[in-house]
């Protein structure tokens, strides 16, 4: 991000494991294949590997090789506090995509910050950014200087609600997730890769969402479009939503369709979305 080029300079060269990772290790919640996302210099992975775990480092600056598999446990220690909101959103999406369906991620954030925004780094003498962070995930641990959130895929958490989008099936394949929005593949796809972007809070249609929810949906639409392009290599897309029964809406919980299109999937694609009314596409 152009506005935050020095976030990597906030990584500390430590001689021991970080407090959140040691806490989680002592609590026995670190399982299976582990990823330290935003690992800095890699001290936590060094500690966990010495304890018999298989822990991979990923850091855009210090360990830039992006992981090519999914993980049982993902750690993200003090990363979000030094990122701009749009960078935070990207991290949340990437971690959701790297986590196995039954896995858990732990986001540690600082609770002792006194100053917010840009400041001059006391060692490197360049502007670095910091902010307070609150997530709508389970608060797993908290003290005066640290809070650890536990994240699981939205599709894997039974929240007691009845709606198919408020409490989606654990069999639904998650594509990506943000704090307020998630994406899954459509159960009855129009084409290969047909995906849905769904706000977690139930609203009847797009125009009842808050501005923040609309922004989150737009971020997710762009992310899912990129994922589908890489995975299915379509020739085009139809993206949109139905509002009210007259427009074909059957589930009254806002959801945005992302429908990949392929050359030859219909005889004459001219007019695209105009074809919701037969005969109106060819004009």
Whereabouts are the PLM-identified features?
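Short functional linear motifs
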Residues: 88, 92, 211-214
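Alpha-helical scaffold elements within enzyme catalytic domains, especially in hydrolases
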Residues: 47, 94-97, 227
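A short His-aromatic
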Residues: 81-83
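HIT superfamily nucleotide-processing domains
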Residues: 157-283
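A conserved beta-strand element that flanks and buttresses the S-adenosyl-L-methionine
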Residues: 75
């Amino acid at each position: 991000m152009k506005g935050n080029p020095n976030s990597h300079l906030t990584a500390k060269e430590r001689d021991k494991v970080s407090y959140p990772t040691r806490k989680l290790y002592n609590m026995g919640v670190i399982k299976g294949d582990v990823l330290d996302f935003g690992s800095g210099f890699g001290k936590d992975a060094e500690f966990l590997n010495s304890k018999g775990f298989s822990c991979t480092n990923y850091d855009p600056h210090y360990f830039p090789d992006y992981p090519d598999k999914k993980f049982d446990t993902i750690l993200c220690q003090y990363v979000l506090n030094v990122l701009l909101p749009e960078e935070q959103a990207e991290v949340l999406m990437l971690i959701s995509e790297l986590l196995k369906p039954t896995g858990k991620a732990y986001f540690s954030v600082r609770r002792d910050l006194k100053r917010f925004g840009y400041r001059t780094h006391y060692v490197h003498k360049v502007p670095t950014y910091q902010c307070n962070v609150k997530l709508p995930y389970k608060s797993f641990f908290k003290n005066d200087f640290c809070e650890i959130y536990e994240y699981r895929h939205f599709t894997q958490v039974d929240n007691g609600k009845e709606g198919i989008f408020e409490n989606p099936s654990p069999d639904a394949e998650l594509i990506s997730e943000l704090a307020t929005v998630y994406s899954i593949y459509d159960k009855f796809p129009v084409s290969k890769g047909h995906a849905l972007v769904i706000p977690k809070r139930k609203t009847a249609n797009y125009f009842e969402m808050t501005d923040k929810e609309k922004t989150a949906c737009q971020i997710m639409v762009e992310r899912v479009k990129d994922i589908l392009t890489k995975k299915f290599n379509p020739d085009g897309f139809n993206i949109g939503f139905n509002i009210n029964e007259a427009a074909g809406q059957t589930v009254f919980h806002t959801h945005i369709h992302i429908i990949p299109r392929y050359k030859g999937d219909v005889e004459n694609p001219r007019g695209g979305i105009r074809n919701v009314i037969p005969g109106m596409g060819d004009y």
